[in-house]
A protein has these predicted regions:
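A short, structured loop/turn motif at beta-sheet edges
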Residues: 39-43, 92-98, 118-127, 164-167
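Short beta-edge strand/loop motif at the mouth of beta-sheet-based domains
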Residues: 53-88, 94-99
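Beta-strand/loop substructures that line and gate deep hydrophobic ligand-binding cavities in soluble
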Residues: 104-157, 162-164, 173-176
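Hydrophobic/aromatic beta-strand elements that line small-molecule binding cavities or substrate pockets
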Residues: 34, 87-93, 113-121
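Hydrophobic pocket/interface hotspot
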Residues: 44-49, 55, 77, 91, ...
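Sec-exported extracytoplasmic/periplasmic mature domains
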Residues: 50, 54-57, 96, 160-167, ...
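Hydrophobic ligand-binding cavity/cleft-lining segments
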Residues: 7-70
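N-terminal hydrophobic targeting signals that begin at the initiator methionine
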Residues: 1-3
């Protein structure tokens, strides 16, 4: 009987410690980029991306996006996802109609990162690229992100929603780093 109990405890310990240890061997930081082509001119794409308050109107992952009144001189937005998790975003750089950089400014999240949106004119349309410079602090979340979610998932969903907002079917292309 004691062997069974010890065996069961060992199994539970392995199930808890195994993912943690595996996650410790994965890098904390990652850099990923994805791009899409749109038939829209850069000014139109810029207007949509720069309107952080309008994201819930076209990206279903974002349920609300409001300016943070306590941002002081900095432009900070609080975006909430479908589960109600708040993500405070600082606008780091804004160069119309080509470059927007936002950074997660929360201290108690299991992740952090910077999104760089680049809009390039290509013919009469635009190439839109989102680069994520991310960091996942919790080793178990690192393992889950690597095995089940993928680091491109959120930027790909954003780009697909952007294309859909303009009535275009797009498939994000992963850009090698």
């Amino acid at each position: 009987m004691l062997k069974w109990i010890l065996g069961l405890l060992g199994l539970v310990a392995a199930l808890v410690a195994g993912p943690f240890i595996a996650g410790m061997f994965l890098p904390r930081q990652h850099v990923v980029s994805s791009s899409i082509m749109l038939s829209q001119p850069p000014d139109s794409v810029w207007a949509l991306l720069r309107d952080l308050g309008g994201y819930p109107n076209w990206w279903s992952d974002i349920k609300s996006s409001v300016p943070d009144e306590q941002g002081g001189d900095e432009e900070v937005w609080i975006q909430k996802d479908a589960q109600g998790h708040a993500l405070p975003l600082l606008v780091v750089q804004s160069i119309p109609p080509a470059l927007l950089v936002t950074e997660i400014v929360a201290e108690k999240l299991p992740f952090a990162g910077v999104w760089t949106y680049e809009i390039e004119q290509v013919g009469a349309g635009s190439r839109v690229t989102i680069r994520e410079d991310g960091e996942v602090f919790n080793p178990i979340f690192r393992l889950v992100a690597r095995l089940f979610l993928g680091h491109h998932t959120t930027i790909d969903r954003c780009l697909a929603a952007l294309g859909q907002r303009f009535g275009e079917q797009v498939i994000p292309v992963h850009v090698p780093q």
